[in-house]
Amino acid sequence: MKRTRLVVLSDNRTNNKLLQTEHGLSVYLECPSGKYLLDTGASDLFIRNAKVLGIDLADVDYCLISHGHNDHIGGLPYFLKLNSKAKVILSGAIPGTEYASMRRYQHSLTGDVDFSQDKDRFVFVNESSNVGAVKVYANIDKRNPLPLGNKNLLCSDAAKQFMPDNFIHELAFVIDGVLFTGCAHSGILNI
């Protein structure tokens, strides 16, 4: 039986002195059903770290974007240039929405992604569904309390006015029976 392999390509910290760090998350997943990239960090750092580790991201079948904050989606333009085949699964609530943090001072969390390019590669999900071998959970019901760190996070409404982030842009993924999430802003107990 083939096992699931998980390799952190980008994070705030690392124990591997050969890898660089950034405020961002990117995880390479090698599962029985295929090769996946969960989030793309804030820059192209995940690509540089993958090269150091001998991981060929051109072979990835699906890129899974957990939510719209730039430390998870910021590297997507670099990934799309490197990998010509992978479908990108993300929330349909991400395009056109701006994100910000009020922690210490207001600063943007909006990723710089042109969704009009490579349109055929994006799979926008608004309802829980299956995409290939991936079970995608959207519109996560928030029955339990949300993480306290969310209180400083904002998103824009249709009029581009900021309001508390409702995290309708957050997705969770189940691949081969394993749950994957980014920050779990919706609360891990809710996911």
Go through each PLM region and give its residues.
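A general structural motif
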Residues: 1-3, 33, 59-60, 85
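Short Pro/Gly-enriched beta-strand edge/turn motifs at strand-loop
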Residues: 1-14, 151-159
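Conserved beta-strand hairpin/beta-sheet module of binuclear metal-dependent hydrolase folds
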Residues: 4-52, 165-181
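Short, acidic Gly/Pro/Ser/Thr-rich loop/turn segments
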Residues: 13-16, 45, 143-146, 186-187
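Active-site metal-binding motif and surrounding structural segment of the metallo-beta-lactamase
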Residues: 45-96
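Cap/insert and terminal regions of metallo-dependent hydrolase folds
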Residues: 69-72, 87, 166-191
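Metallo-beta-lactamase
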Residues: 94-170
